From Swiss-Prot:
Membrane topology: Multi-pass membrane protein
A GO cellular component entry from the record: late endosome
Protein location: Membrane
Main location group: membrane
Protein name: Cation/H(+) antiporter 18
Function noted in UniProt: May operate as a cation/H(+) antiporter.
The organism of origin for this protein: Arabidopsis thaliana
Tissue specificity annotation: Expressed in roots.
PTM-bearing positions, type Phosphoserine: S804
Biological processes annotated in GO: potassium ion transport; proton transmembrane transport; regulation of pH
Family per record: Belongs to the monovalent cation:proton antiporter 2 (CPA2) transporter (TC 2.A.37) family. CHX (TC 2.A.37.4) subfamily.
Gene3D superfamilies from the UniProt entry: 1.20.1530.20
Listed Pfam families: CHX17_2nd, CHX17_C, Na_H_Exchanger
Amino acid sequence: MATNSTKACPAPMKATSNGVFQGDNPIDFALPLAILQIVIVIVLTRVLAYLLRPLRQPRVIAEVIGGIMLGPSLLGRSKAFLDAVFPKKSLTVLETLANLGLLFFLFLAGLEIDTKALRRTGKKALGIALAGITLPFALGIGSSFVLKATISKGVNSTAFLVFMGVALSITAFPVLARILAELKLLTTEIGRLAMSAAAVNDVAAWILLALAIALSGSNTSPLVSLWVFLSGCAFVIGASFIIPPIFRWISRRCHEGEPIEETYICATLAVVLVCGFITDAIGIHSMFGAFVVGVLIPKEGPFAGALVEKVEDLVSGLFLPLYFVASGLKTNVATIQGAQSWGLLVLVTATACFGKILGTLGVSLAFKIPMREAITLGFLMNTKGLVELIVLNIGKDRKVLNDQTFAIMVLMALFTTFITTPVVMAVYKPARRAKKEGEYKHRAVERENTNTQLRILTCFHGAGSIPSMINLLEASRGIEKGEGLCVYALHLRELSERSSAILMVHKVRKNGMPFWNRRGVNADADQVVVAFQAFQQLSRVNVRPMTAISSMSDIHEDICTTAVRKKAAIVILPFHKHQQLDGSLETTRGDYRWVNRRVLLQAPCSVGIFVDRGLGGSSQVSAQDVSYSVVVLFFGGPDDREALAYGLRMAEHPGIVLTVFRFVVSPERVGEIVNVEVSNNNNENQSVKNLKSDEEIMSEIRKISSVDESVKFVEKQIENAAVDVRSAIEEVRRSNLFLVGRMPGGEIALAIRENSECPELGPVGSLLISPESSTKASVLVIQQYNGTGIAPDLGAAETEVLTSTDKDSD
């Protein structure tokens, strides 16, 4: 008997091989085979994610499809492939790695749920969450009777009803966050409602899942299920008293900007594993313990964020895809055969959609949410994802769901998530509303009435450029005559594959910026918060913070839309290079350059690109300490007039001395510096108009400089464009800031355009930041809004490439 048993059971796999040269096949050993499986999974899911990117689908769709493709539904139909890559004897190792990844992923998911924020959830979000759970849960129980009578005969009735109810009522919180971010709804009112409701739904789903697991044990005695459930409750209560104080103590010893001690990280991961072991021993599931630890860890301070940074990439990128493969190996679409099976698939899918959408729609309309937004909320709340797969896999492992029911439920989850993005894009288009709101008067700094409020939208990627940017804004506020200055500080955050980059919206408030209004400002407060709050309080400038979370390929749309909605006169963008210690400029990120170019092409107002070379030093300068020398290099044309208008605004500040350099052609060289051909009467008329406007503003500058000591006017006659312009710059090389137009007009500017190495800065800006330039001052390059949507001299081919994406999106 022992011999027969030995023959029936394959020998366990050894960990490592001796190598092919000693006759070993690497895939007959556990470690090389696991490596091969991981590589195949990662490559396949990433390729699918890339292919689905134009459809703006979340990565979970690609991972689910990839898992199904590797299973018996497609590639797994080949016995040779299945035996070679996913042999049965390797599945224990594969599922162990997958569940370990799942354990830590659920810990991260718990970290992203702020219990204090849940307690502050408004009536609207709470009502939407409850309706989105109860109605689909009830309908799920109803449809489960049909399934049980047809394809799921003989299963535990109570457990089956609860599993089906949970599976149909779940909203995938992380997946919803990514969809909202992709659709640029993350920080809108509808986005905040959806996220708050989904967070409540998520917690309720875990409670129901724990109940379902307790009811689905192999022991038929209801007393055992009761003990499992009560033990789980006791674990949660005990952890609630023990875990928060310990981690609050750890968090107080971790400081912003300083590395977190390895001891704290290792101790936390050990606690996660221990709690996972305890809940597994109770009979719930190890992931439940990990999730509870994540929820209970206090979110204040840098410790929670540091944990995510340490764990997330390895778990989400390496281990978690294995869970989708383990799920895909159990999914056999071929089991769905015949009219009955496909009819049941339609029934389950319709029930899931109908319950979520109708429940959400009814409550939304009761709260007087507009119909279009209510329908959008319904489809958003219908998003499924990893949590759905977890429920289904637990049901499959516990023999509550058979192969056919499991396949039907997986396809239902895939379909409901897949349709969310296109339906929401069709139903709810906030861009339409932005276009209606798009008419406003002051789209440039240059204007007839200088007493009107100047609205600036300043953008930044990180904390490094904040001091100089604030010093620039301080210099721009003038003397607060008229309506003063209003600043919109837009934090540009890249929408990466990392869920933590998206789920920070837990902290978003009505101002739209997640890191702005943290409770209390202490030593650990973010330096960005401190800097802007200090500027707002000391300079009495109205600063309104916001955030934009988007991919670098279309974040320019967020910038332009925000400029329209906030009626900005000028958008100030950081240059894509930063200054090094030796004074040279190094590229921060190449895609920042393309963001700037796209904004130059599509901006609804004037645009400034700020080359930061340490304006005011490395710290914020208070109003009384401002002492800057600002130089405007004026050649002519609308961009130069816009730069001069900005300079005159700065000159109102008591700490600013403005020097205006006007470059004119020497009378002996008129027409000789460059040969200008006028192609038509329109260009000739425009040139005459620009020349007249230039002369008018120069006449005004002469008058101002004669009565105001803070404004100096210097006129330079040019004979050799390149040499004489460099010579003029040499005279004021010790200035703090240069203001220049991006595309200056006039004969001299045309002569130096050939030397423009950086089209977005124009010829003069490129000259000022070139290695040969004698000045190391900061530079603000300004393009005046012209109303045509054309940014000259960005290159025809480049312009076509930059705008093609936006045409496609329209």
